[in-house]
């Protein structure tokens, strides 16, 4: 038996072998665009699975998917060993189907520690009736206020889920300021009596983030902002807007459910430190 992890073009032809509920949309999208991060898992030169490897300085993200006809034969374990040899980072983050207990235990048995999970949700309804709120496009002079409210809101969320014990507030920087300015056309702020109380951004079909200033939460502003931003995506021609909700973020999940967003799939993340 010779399991190898190799580059191969046109991996999208293997998409019919992939279970969407297991792999999730992102892996399939990477296969469709023939991403540089996609590799074939081969057995004696025959493709028996695929893997996604994004090896960055702060951690390597991987997904391993063995086609069903080749499972329960030890090929997944051998493939994971080969993938780990390729990783240069000191930490590996394995992505798996959160509701797939077999996949979770497969990783745990090999030294990975499940840390957190996130659910992709999709909306396929009509435009919302939105309360009278003041929303405008983000401007550079908004940076300090918008950054501070978004950073604190997400820090509180991370701590609240119990999945991010090392979460800390970030500091504003010129680098992040320029990055925000670069994508200003996709960023929006909500104002109340001249004060910035909300920030949101979109990317393609996705409502990427929505955050409300801590002092103004639990007043219905978040729900109204989500309605407004969903409508913006629909106005851009997006037929089914999507968003992600961290598992354990109970308040946000309740809002999304009440608005008609439906769970599509849920991905889990498991970490392992390497010896490098």
Where are these regions (language model features)?
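A structural microfeature
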Residues: 49, 116-117, 198, 222, ...
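Acyl-donor-binding surface of acyltransferase catalytic domains
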Residues: 71-133, 270-271
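Conserved acetyl-CoA-binding loop-helix of GNAT-fold acetyltransferases
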Residues: 72-86, 212, 218-232, 254, ...
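Conserved GNAT-fold acetyl-CoA-binding loop/helix
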Residues: 8-31, 155-177
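Conserved hydrophobic beta-strand within the GNAT/NAT acetyltransferase core sheet
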Residues: 62, 92-97, 207, 241-245
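Conserved donor-binding loop and adjoining core beta-sheet/short helix segment
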Residues: 25-78, 197-208
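A short beta-loop-alpha structural element at the N-terminal edge
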Residues: 1-14, 134-159
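C-terminal "cap" of GNAT-fold acetyltransferases
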Residues: 116-141, 242-250, 262, 266-276
């Amino acid at each position: 038996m010779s399991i190898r992890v190799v580059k191969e073009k046109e991996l999208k032809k293997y998409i019919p072998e992939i279970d969407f509920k297991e792999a999730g949309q992102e892996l399939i999208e990477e296969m469709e665009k023939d991403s540089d991060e996609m590799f074939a898992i081969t057995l004696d030169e025959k493709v028996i699975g695929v893997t996604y490897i994004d090896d960055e300085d702060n951690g390597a993200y991987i997904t391993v998917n063995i086609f069903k006809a080749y499972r329960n034969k030890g090929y997944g374990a051998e493939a994971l060993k080969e993938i780990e040899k390729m990783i240069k980072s000191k930490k590996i983050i394995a992505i798996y189907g959160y509701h797939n207990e077999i996949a979770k235990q497969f990783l745990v048995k090999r030294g990975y520690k499940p840390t957190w999970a996130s659910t992709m949700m999709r909306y396929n309804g009509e435009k919302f009736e939105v309360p009278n709120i003041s929303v405008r496009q983000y401007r550079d002079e908004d940076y300090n206020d918008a950054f501070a409210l978004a950073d604190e809101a997400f820090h509180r969320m991370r701590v609240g889920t119990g999945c991010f014990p090392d979460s800390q507030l970030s500091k504003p920087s010129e680098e992040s300021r320029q990055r925000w300015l670069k994508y200003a056309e996709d960023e929006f702020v909500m104002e109340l009596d001249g004060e910035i109380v909300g920030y949101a951004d979109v990317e393609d079909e996705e409502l990427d983030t929505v955050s409300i200033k801590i002092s103004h939460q639990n007043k219905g502003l978040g729900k109204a902002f989500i309605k407004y931003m969903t409508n913006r995506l629909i106005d851009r021609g997006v037929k089914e807007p999507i968003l992600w909700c961290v598992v354990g973020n109970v308040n946000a999940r309740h809002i999304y459910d009440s608005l008609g967003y439906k769970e599509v799939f849920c991905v889990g993340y498991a970490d392992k430190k390497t010896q490098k």
